[in-house]
Structures are given as structure tokens and as C-alpha cells.
From Swiss-Prot:
Single GO biological process annotation from the record: phosphatidylethanolamine biosynthetic process
Record's subunit section: Heterodimer of a large membrane-associated beta subunit and a small pyruvoyl-containing alpha subunit.
Catalytic activity: a 1,2-diacyl-sn-glycero-3-phospho-L-serine + H(+) = a 1,2-diacyl-sn-glycero-3-phosphoethanolamine + CO2
Protein name from the UniProt record: Phosphatidylserine decarboxylase proenzyme
Pyruvic acid (Ser) modifications at: 190
Primary localisation category: membrane
Active site: 190 (schiff-base intermediate with substrate)
Function: Catalyzes the formation of phosphatidylethanolamine (PtdEtn) from phosphatidylserine (PtdSer).
Tagged with keyword Transmembrane helix: no
Species annotation: Bartonella bacilliformis (strain ATCC 35685 / KC583 / Herrer 020/F12,63)
Bilayer topology: Peripheral membrane protein
EC number assigned by the record: 4.1.1.65
Lineage: Bacteria, Pseudomonadati, Pseudomonadota, Alphaproteobacteria, Hyphomicrobiales
Biological pathway: Phospholipid metabolism; phosphatidylethanolamine biosynthesis; phosphatidylethanolamine from CDP-diacylglycerol: step 2/2
Amino acid sequence: MSVFRSIRDGVVPIHKEGYPFIVAFFVASLILGWIWDPLFWFGLVLTVWCIYFFRDPERVTPMNADWVVSPADGRISFVGLCVPPEELDLGKNEMMRVSVFMDVFSCHINRAPVSGTIESIVYSPGKFVNADLDKASEFNERNGVVIDSKHGKIGVVQIAGLVARRIICWSKEDDSVAAGQRFGMIRFGSRLDVYMPAEIKLRVAVGQTSIAGETVLGSFDSDITTTDFRLN
């Protein structure tokens, strides 16, 4: 294996959504440095942070139709039964909700929690309160995705936060998705809520760190030890 290939394989890819921001931060660094030298280094630090923010690493996803994986990197901020948002059209019965809060240092690529077909995508305008607050699921700008899976409908809601002002969803209605597949992102701090059937067996707890496409949030079977995996 060549040295160049080793270096290439060791570098985490950057998502193309970040290119304009990275260029803008670097140009701003040059301009600030022209005004006052120390400002260049300040701008350069922000540029490096921007590169880090838009990283898009590959993930090894467990391929088990009975499991629900995390759609986001971050901290589990809520676990419990809740009535899903009306716009998801998932009924008025309580479903199990797991919320994942992403801070500005989290990887913000969002991944499908299950394999299935996207039944609906619903965008709802709203406010930009702290995404870590429970009321954010009701009042903040958000984008809801409903996936028809082996175990019924699973809802995923991308929620904007104080800093995040841009929700991106690349998938479309009627698209087929695989668990762990990239479907969108939210820029600069946010939250994802996952709504699952109430009978699911939870595998996470509040305060736990989750990895998108890898951490199992819950399962519909009792066996959590064996499965196949896929690189995403």
C-alpha cells in the first residue's frame, strides 16, 4: 500500500455541503489577517473547526431488520412515551421517543434509523429555541420523515436549534432507504427525535452518547448479540 493511499484512507471525508463555508471562513481569515495579523490565526482556528464540523465519516451499520439505530451523533437527551407530532400522521397513541441532541462539535450527518420506504416528508416552520429543551419538538423549525418499515411506521424529526438555521433532507417521498443510509443534515447544532412503536425494547438511556448508524436505540427481538454489518 502506498504512502499516499495510507494518508488518503486515514483522512475523514468532508461533506460537500461544507465546502462553501470552509472557503468563506478561510477567505475571511486572510482578510482579517491583512487588517491585523493575530486575527488570521483566530480565523484559521474557525476554519479548522468548520472542516471538523462537516466531516462525513463512514459508519459500520448492523443490518438487522428488528433493530432501530441512531440517526445522529450526540447525547441521548430524552427517552419515554410521547404522542407524536400531528404532522407525522402517526395517530394519537403514545409512541416511544428517543431524542438525540447534537452540539456544535457533533458530526451532523443524519442517517436512516431503519430500512424501508419513505412514506412522507413534512416541513414545519417554527422558532429557534434551544434544541435541548423538550418544547423544541413542538415549537422549533423541523422536518419530519416517516419510514414504513418491517415493524410499521417509524418517525424521524430533524429539529433546528439556537444556532442551526438550515435543515437539509436529501431523500424524497417513495425513496427506499437502508438503515444507516445518509438522508440529511442540520447545520450547527440541533436535535433528532425518533418515534418508534411503544412495545420496542430500549437499548439506550438518557445521558448516553450515540453514534449515527451504529448505536442501537431499540430492538423488536430479544437477541442483541449477532447480526451482519454494512459499511455506510
